[in-house]
């Protein structure tokens, strides 16, 4: 293993980067237009979409003979549209999961303020960290419903159904995971036709995917940083073809499964097929799509 060395590469401006790409064998039909793109899109960000076009060994940074800058921008645009598509679908899941957690917990505990009551949680340190975050969200909020609550009521925190509107999905999932009452958690998971462990795993995947979409990160050929659980039993259709659970296709399947429990007549399948049809030159294989995926029962619905 080589010893680490100091970083000594110099920063290069857009015009120099265009020349660098040309020297490495990338065809650029309109260098001035490519230069404009590189002035608005960080080269390091764009290089992720160049990587599939490199010859092996990729460390030599030589492009395949048919590689063109147009392909780079096509992959970039496809990834952007995929990101927006996934985010829009996840939004529906986020709202449904928040509602399920608040509904089941408030009904079971008979306490409107359970979210800020330590007695309902396993780990007191995690609870305190969450409480600090909740306090911060309430204090900084400019929402009219928060202003109304502060003006009208003497309680230090709003009830759970109001707090749920202020916090990110990741925090809501952490609150769920820290709940003491296992039966309540099982009931929440069953609302989405899942066993508790699978629900926990899949909600983590959905949260990580949502965060990638929010931060404009690459999702097209990115691998999951954790392995999602494979369900043994589901109440709705699930995939049967062998699929790589680390690839975005598996994430899309998880999203579709949740949507089928929330809105059985959803059109996610149609929208995904339309997106792929609009970018026929994008190879679905690096995303983990198996041959015949569109014939799965999961994707035949909607």
Give, region by region, the residue ranges found by the protein language model.
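Extended intrinsically disordered or low-complexity regions, especially N/C-terminal cytosolic tails and loops
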Residues: 1-208, 220-302
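Acidic/aromatic/glycine-rich contiguous surface patches that form carbohydrate-binding/processing clefts
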Residues: 216
